[in-house]
Structures are given as structure tokens and as C-alpha cells.
């Protein structure tokens, strides 16, 4: 039987807090389930909604001025959400409402509200790069890798983009400046800051408080547009979340990383924004081309990749003094694949202190083998490299998340060989190791190459797990 709690036997203060929040006397079950949330509930109850409404209106005026909605509509949506618990009787939904309201109450002002106040002066820190001089070289390199055969019968996943992306991009530009210790960008927008001729869509970010930021942003969009916003977590992308609207249109995504990982990511400072060092991004692009899907993307739009590649090549030429004369020495390093055990052995003794690198194509197998080694010095760089690295007895152990292309039976394609070398160089950059000679040889090994057809490729590691999501409208959190 669901009875009201006896006010004589229950702590009066806690009961009053819950009663005020729910707008009704809680049932016995509600009281006992919610009493440990009393502190959070009290913060929500005393939260100044008028100031919050003002901040959202200012965010709307600055970043969403073209969205047709009135100030009164925004206020009504906010007040409606902060009173939603009064019409909710499901305990699970009440917990979700409390959790999400708590995020808004405790973080919104510092994360998004701060974007409405006067910004610090922008420190102009751009260098003029002669990207044009690298365009022909980039085109030659990419042409030799343009070997994917497109299967016209293959159904490609559609990536529908929301019309709000341009508004969110405007907000993100300011966010990256205000929060440049906890949020950095990479990808097309970061290269656009170096070369304004680069085209970009949404802004790719790494940050240390991704979940909180995305929840705050989702509510901002909800309060301004009235649309239901859903946050999704993808199991095979590590610490990745994406915001989509109710029609499954992509708005923005983000990878979350630890602060200690953020501290070691190579980065440069441009106009008050930190971007991932283009040298590091170039290595990631070389690694990425081992993925068969990315080669298909290259085949569809080579000029898009050419602009990015030329920009990064010019950056490394200018920054590291790389001479592009075709001197490749021992690059790419020798790679031997064991297809049965799904391990590639890379001979590294010509460049590094460890003599070889065992590259696992199954992450769980690597984790098991590291445990067997009883070694506790592995480095986990999360989504920055999608792998741990361990050096033990002059052997590096690591995981490679992409496909391995083969040019013949049992023979690693040179595109994948370079991708594996780039993966090792990412570790060298992250740990402040030596990489410049190896980088020079790797880039020169991409010059003047003929196209080599793909014989076959290994499959990617299958990632376990389920999709998670936060549905604001339905008060559901599944993670």
C-alpha cells in the first residue's frame, strides 16, 4: 500500500525539501528513494531561475539570433522543465530529472553562461604558410593511395546534418577560446585556422568535461528551439558522445579525455584557441588511410583531402624543416602479418630503442597479454590514439584499431605499413621521444609512388557494448 510518510517519525527538514520540490507530500517510497538526493534537490529548489532565463536569452541573442523564438517562449520552456517533477511519479524518471537539473544548476553558468560576458582580447598568433607550394606534392601522395574500388551496391550510412550546426559552430569558436585549458580542437576547423581555404562542417573537439558540456548545450538548444534533443554514446568509439535532434540530425559530437591525457597532447595556440599540432594530425591522417572506408572517402572527394594534406605538409616543412627530396631510408618499416593470430610485427630497431613492435588487431587479446607480462608501465592515451602502448624487454606492444590492407596474400600493403609507422610515431610525440628523422623518412616514402591495388584487408576489431543515450523529453538515461 502506498501511504504518505508519517511526518512525526521522519526528519522534518528532508521531508520539507522533497515536498517543496515535488509540489506534493511524497509517498513513503518517494521519500526513501529521494532522501539521499536532498542536497541536490535543495540546490535545484533555491536556484535562481530568473538569472538562468536571462543567461539563456543572452546565449540565444549571441549565437542563435536567426532562430525564430520569443523571449517568453524560452522562459516558459525553462520554467516548465524546472517544474516537470511535479507531474512525474515514476521514481526512475524523477532520478533522471534531478540529475539533469543538477547539471544545469551547478555547471551551466561556468560552462555556457560565461560566453555571454565580454571576452578577453584575442592574441593574434597566426603564421603565414605557403600552402600552395605543397598542393602538387599532396596531390601526388594522395593519388598513389587512391586505390579503393567503390562497391556501388554498398549501402552507405547517411550522416544528416542539422541546420543548427552553423549556430553551434559560432558558439564553439567562443567556447574554445574561453575554455582552452579543457577543450581543444582538431580536424578541418583547426586547419582552417591555418589555411582559410579549408572547408569545414562541424568543429571536432577533445575535452575533459564532455558529458557535462553536451548536457548543458543540449538544454540550451532545447530551450531555444523547443525541439527534443538526444545525446548518444557509441560503444565502439571510446568516450564519444553526439548530440542529435529528434529527427536524428547530427549537431555536434565530442570525445572525452582525462586531464593527464590533455596535458600531453601536442598542441599549438592560434587566436586564443589550442589546436592539436598539425604534425600529430598528419600522422593520424596517414594512419587513417589504412582504414578501407577512408580510402573510399578519398576516392569520392580527393580535393577535400588534398587541401588538408597540403596544409599539414606545409606546416611540417615550415616547423620541422622537413626536406621533401625522396630520401626514405628504412621507411616504411618492415611489417609482417600473422593473419591467424591477428598480430603485425613491425621492425623498429633502425629508428628506436625498442627492436620491434607487436601490433595487435584485437584489443582484448592485447590486454590479456599485457596482464601475462605482469608489466604496469603501459600508457593509455584514450581516443587520442585509440590504444594503449607498452614497452617491455625492448618490445613495444600496442593495438591498431583500423583495418590492415594487403597488397598480396600475407603481404602488408605499403599504405597500412605507413599507417602502422605513424601509429608508433604518435606514441613518440606523446611521450616527447625522438620522431623527426623518422617523420621525414615516412613522409618522403610517400613520394613518387605507383598505385598498388588492394588484394584484401583484415576486418576491424569487433567492439562489445551497447549504445547509451540521454533522452531529455522522455527523462531516460541509459549508459
From Swiss-Prot:
EC number, as in UniProt: 2.7.7.19
Induction, as annotated: Expressed in the early phase of the viral replicative cycle.
Record-listed Ca(2+) 2 binding positions: 202, 204, 253
Annotated catalytic residues: 202, 204
Chain sites annotated for binding Ca(2+) 1: 202, 204
Domain of life: Viruses
Any one Gene Ontology molecular-function term assigned to this protein's record: metal ion binding
Pfam families per the UniProt record, alphabetical: Pox_polyA_pol, Pox_polyA_pol_C, Pox_polyA_pol_N
Enzyme class: transferase
Keywords linked to the UniProt accession: ATP-binding, Calcium, Early protein, Metal-binding, mRNA processing, Nucleotide-binding, Transcription, Transferase
Gene Ontology terms: biological process: mRNA processing
Catalyzed reactions per annotation: RNA(n) + ATP = RNA(n)-3'-adenine ribonucleotide + diphosphate
Subunit relationships: Heterodimer of a large (catalytic) subunit and a small (regulatory) subunit.
Family label: Belongs to the poxviridae poly(A) polymerase catalytic subunit family.
Known function: Polymerase that creates the 3'-poly(A) tail of mRNA's.
Protein name stated in the entry: Poly(A) polymerase catalytic subunit
Native source species: Cowpox virus (strain Brighton Red) (CPV)
Lineage of the species this protein comes from: Viruses, Varidnaviria, Bamfordvirae, Nucleocytoviricota, Pokkesviricetes
Amino acid at each position: 500500500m502506498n501511504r504518505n510518510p508519517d511526518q512525526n517519525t521522519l526528519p522534518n527538514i528532508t521531508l520539507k525539501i522533497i515536498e517543496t520540490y515535488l509540489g506534493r507530500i511524497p509517498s513513503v517510497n518517494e521519500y526513501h528513494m529521494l532522501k539521499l538526493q536532498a542536497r541536490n534537490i535543495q540546490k535545484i529548489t533555491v536556484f535562481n531561475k530568473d538569472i538562468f532565463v536571462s543567461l539563456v536569452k543572452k546565449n540565444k541573442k549571441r549565437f542563435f539570433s536567426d532562430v525564430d523564438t520569443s523571449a517568453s517562449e524560452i522562459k516558459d520552456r525553462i520554467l516548465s522543465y524546472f517544474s516537470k517533477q511535479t507531474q512525474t511519479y515514476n521514481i526512475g524518471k524523477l532520478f533522471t530529472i534531478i540529475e539533469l537539473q543538477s547539471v544545469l544548476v551547478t555547471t551551466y553558468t561556468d560552462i555556457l553562461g560565461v560566453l555571454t560576458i565580454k571576452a578577453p582580447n584575442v592574441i593574434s598568433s597566426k603564421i603565414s604558410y605557403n600552402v600552395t607550394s605543397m598542393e602538387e606534392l599532396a596531390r601526388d601522395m594522395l593519388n598513389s593511395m587512391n586505390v579503393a574500388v567503390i562497391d556501388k551496391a554498398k549501402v552507405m550510412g547517411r550522416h544528416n546534418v542539422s541546420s543548427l550546426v552553423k549556430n553551434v559552430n559560432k558558439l564553439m569558436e567562443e567556447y574554445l577560446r574561453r575554455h582552452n585549458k579543457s577543450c581543444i580542437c582538431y580536424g578541418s576547423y583547426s586547419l582552417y585556422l591555418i589555411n582559410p581555404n579549408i572547408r569545414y562542417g562541424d568543429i571536432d573537439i577533445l575535452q575533459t568535461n564532455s558529458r557535462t558540456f553536451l548536457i548543458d548545450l543540449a538544454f540550451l538548444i532545447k530551450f531555444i528551439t523547443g525541439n527534443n534533443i538526444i545525446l548518444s554514446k557509441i560503444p565502439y568509439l571510446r568516450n564519444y558522445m553526439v548530440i542529435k535532434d529528434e529527427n536524428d540530425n547530427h549537431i555536434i559530437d565530442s570525445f572525452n579525455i582525462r586531464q593527464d591525457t590533455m596535458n600531453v597532447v601536442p598542441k599549438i595556440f592560434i587566436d586564443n584557441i589550442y589546436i592539436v599540432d598539425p604534425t600529430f594530425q598528419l600522422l593520424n591522417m596517414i594512419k587513417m588511410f589504412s582504414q578501407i572506408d577512408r580510402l573510399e572517402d578519398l576516392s569520392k572527394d580527393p580535393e577535400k583531402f588534398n587541401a588538408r594534406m597540403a596544409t599539414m605538409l606545409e606546416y611540417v616543412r615550415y616547423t620541422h624543416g622537413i626536406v621533401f627530396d625522396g630520401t626514405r631510408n628504412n621507411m616504411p618499416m618492415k611489417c609482417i602479418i600473422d593473419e591467424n593470430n591477428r598480430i603485425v610485427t613491425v621492425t623498429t630497431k633502425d629508428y628506436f630503442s625498442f627492436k620491434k613492435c607487436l601490433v595487435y588487431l584485437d584489443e582484448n587479446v592485447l590486454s590479456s597479454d599485457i596482464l601475462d607480462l605482469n608489466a604496469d608501465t603501459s600508457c593509455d592515451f584514450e581516443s587520442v590514439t585509440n590504444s594503449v602502448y607498452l614497452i617491455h624487454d625492448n618490445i613495444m606492444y600496442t593495438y591498431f584499431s583500423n583495418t590492415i590492407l594487403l597488397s598480396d596474400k600475407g603481404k602488408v600493403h605499403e599504405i597500412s605499413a605507413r599507417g602502422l609507422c605513424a601509429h608508433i610515431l604518435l606514441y613518440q610525440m606523446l611521450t616527447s621521444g625522438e620522431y623527426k628523422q623518422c617523420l621525414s623518412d615516412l613522409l618522403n616514402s610517400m613520394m613518387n609512388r605507383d598505385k598498388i591495388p588492394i588484394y584484401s584487408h583484415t576486418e576491424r576489431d569487433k567492439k562489445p557494448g551497447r549504445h547509451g543515450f540521454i533522452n531529455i523529453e522522455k527523462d531516460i538515461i541509459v549508459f
